[in-house]
Regions:
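Ligand-binding loop in jelly-roll beta-barrel domains
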Residues: 53, 68-73
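Amphipathic alpha-helical coiled-coil/heptad-repeat segments
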Residues: 108-156
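A short glycine-rich beta-alpha junction/loop motif
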Residues: 3, 40, 56-64, 74, ...
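Short, Lys/Arg- and Gly-enriched loop/turn segments at beta-strand edges
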Residues: 44-51
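Short, solvent-exposed loop/turn positions at domain surfaces
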Residues: 24-25, 95, 134
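Glycine- and charge-enriched low-complexity intrinsically disordered segments
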Residues: 74-84, 91
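Sequence-specific dsDNA recognition surfaces
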Residues: 2-33
């Protein structure tokens, strides 16, 4: 669960298990690129889509792979991160030291389900915004390098 942040999966820290153990524990299906994963505790409610990755990986005990057969995965990811869903999630969670939710209770929480066409429009919009954010981020990084070069030139 520590690798899943809101809308982002980090591969900075990785733990490895043997192929034999992987085959034993992954009896409920292998996660695929684009699947939506959700943390059920520590931290509660982080959600992201699985990015392109070069190897199989294990989904830990506090992570659920959400079914997306009827929903656009991008739409599902953002619906699960909405303020409305978070309020419902916190209302059904339990635990004094570590807050979490059981999968049966999670399955009873609802999200709005617009037509597939509207879900796809939303997903296309999110993709465009993400591309624009990436372009802006690259520009900021380039400007930062230029600033450092000028500072080096002026101040040695």
């Amino acid at each position: 669960a520590k690798n899943i942040s809101m809308h982002y999966m980090s591969f900075d820290t990785q733990e490895f298990i043997s192929k034999e153990n992987y085959d034993k524990v992954m009896t409920r299906g292998i996660p695929k690129v684009g699947d939506v994963v959700f943390t059920t505790e520590a931290p509660l409610g982080n959600v992201c889509r699985i990015p392109q990755f070069d190897t199989d990986f294990y989904i830990g005990q506090r992570i659920i792979t959400m079914q997306t057969k009827l929903l656009n995965p991008v739409y599902l990811e953002y619906a699960l991160s909405s303020d409305d869903f978070k309020r419902k999630l916190v209302g059904k969670s339990s635990g004094s030291t570590v807050t979490g939710i059981r999968s049966k209770l999670l399955g009873k929480l609802t999200i709005p389900v617009p037509s597939k066409g509207l879900q796809n429009q939303f997903a296309a919009f999110v993709e465009r915004v993400d591309q624009q954010k990436q372009t802006v981020q690259q520009s900021l990084e380039k400007l930062e390098l230029m600033k450092k070069a000028l500072m080096q030139e002026y101040f040695g």
